[in-house]
Regions:
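Active-site entrance/lid segments in N-terminal catalytic domains of soluble metabolic enzymes
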Residues: 1-94
């Protein structure tokens, strides 16, 4: 099936996994991507830029298909390292 979504993301099916806190790890993202959709790693679930970088590398080792990283910006008294997380996503070319 070809749609604007499949063409834009280079996927087989117009299915995009949403970011899901506490379960958005490489295993789920790779399974969705390998099934023809666009899998998604949930950035804040990883906790730190280093852990996110490791999770992206893990996903890349599990699939050669496109996948995404969801990064939700939430108000917080002690926010996570958003600049570091964004840098990892850019450097890892996701």
């Amino acid at each position: 099936m070809k749609t604007k979504i499949t063409e834009l993301f280079g996927i087989e099916h117009p299915i995009i996994q949403g970011g899901m806190h506490h379960v958005g790890f490489a295993e789920l993202a790779a399974a969705v991507s390998n099934g023809g959709g666009l899998g998604t790693i949930t950035g804040l679930t990883q906790g730190t830029p280093e852990k996110l970088a490791n999770e992206i590398d893990k996903c890349k080792s599990m699939t050669d298909k496109p996948f995404a990283v969801n990064l939700t910006f939430l108000p917080s008294l002690t926010p996570p390292d958003y600049p570091g997380l964004v840098d990892v996503i850019v450097v890892k070319d996701v």
